[in-house]
Amino acid sequence: MSARAWVAFGCMSALWGIPYLFIKLAVDDGVPPAFVAWSRVVLAAVVLLALAWRAGSLGPLRGKGRWLAAYAFLEISIPFPMIAFGEQHVASSLAAIIIASVPLFIALLAIRFDQSERATGRRLVGLFVGLGGVVALVGIDVGGRGDELLGAGAIVLAAMGYAAGPMIFKRHLGELDPRATMGGSLAIAALFLTPFALLDPPHAVPTGDGLIAIFVLGIFCTAIAFVIFSGLLMEVGAGRAAVITYINPVVAVGLGVAVLGERPGAGAIAGLLLILAGSWLSTDGRLPPGLAGALERVRARRRAPSHTTGTALVQDP
């Protein structure tokens, strides 16, 4: 990858690893979950729609209203408030680990709805391993504590929404400018979320922590992150960009420990390892093209003979 792509990759690993910290800060400051989600969505929609309007790419959205609405509902309107609600009851690091199960649900849905996906033995093993990680995470770390179990369940529902949304995007919205698609989806999601935000508004003006958290979530973690990610996809492709999925929970857990003083238990660590292993296996256990290519070049060097005074030697690089 180019230096610019590496910078974008680093930015995305951070920008999609930190939302759990800032969601936790916002809800701990007394901002209701629906209002956190609504505020984040409105801020991001304004930024992305402005960029799409400037690029003249809003026109093709005509006729795509029902697919935009379906995508907005599954990818934004369900996950954003569910994660915020869940983080009222569970640690930010636990929320991030549960969201790491998204590739598992994508693979599970693809077997049923994507004819190009086959239920191979490796994929099924990955699904069982990863879903076992979710069970271990919730069962050991949360146990039978009612509020925490409810919060973890809400975040699992968010992960399912994150998994279903891309299928609609791939089939019906993939040919459009992503700034227009995401901006339009965020605007529709804002309409979905407005009644819930009005029914449960903040009882007091949020403090500096709450306001900063909402600003960072909307502008940086949603709008700017999506623009950077779109550029990264165009340069390196989806395969390499997908590595971010494996880094985000590590960033989120690290921030939860360092900033919030969270201490992930044995169930959280075991669940994270099982979920990441299951995600890798359920996506056919392929390394990202960039890493796979680099490893293949190293192997080729090791296999290549070096002729020195008529004797073939295998030299380590």
Role assignments for model-derived ranges:
Residues 41, 139-140, 194, 210-212, ...:
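C-terminal-most transmembrane helix of multi-pass membrane proteins
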Residues 39, 76, 95-101, 166-191, ...:
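Helix-helix packing/entry segments at the starts of transmembrane helices
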Residues 1-39, 85, 144-171, 191, ...:
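Glycine-/small-residue-enriched transmembrane alpha-helix faces in small-molecule transporters
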Residues 26, 36, 40, 86, ...:
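Hydrophobic/aromatic residues within transmembrane alpha-helices
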Residues 48, 69, 101, 109, ...:
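Hydrophobic transmembrane alpha-helices of multi-pass small-molecule transport proteins
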Residues 47-55, 59, 83, 102-125, ...:
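C-terminal transmembrane-helix exit sites in multi-pass transporters
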Residues 15, 19-20, 49-99, 135-136, ...:
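Specific transmembrane alpha-helical segments of multi-pass solute transporters/efflux pumps
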Residues 1-5, 29-38, 60-66, 124, ...:
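Juxtamembrane helix-entry segments on the extracytoplasmic side of multipass membrane proteins
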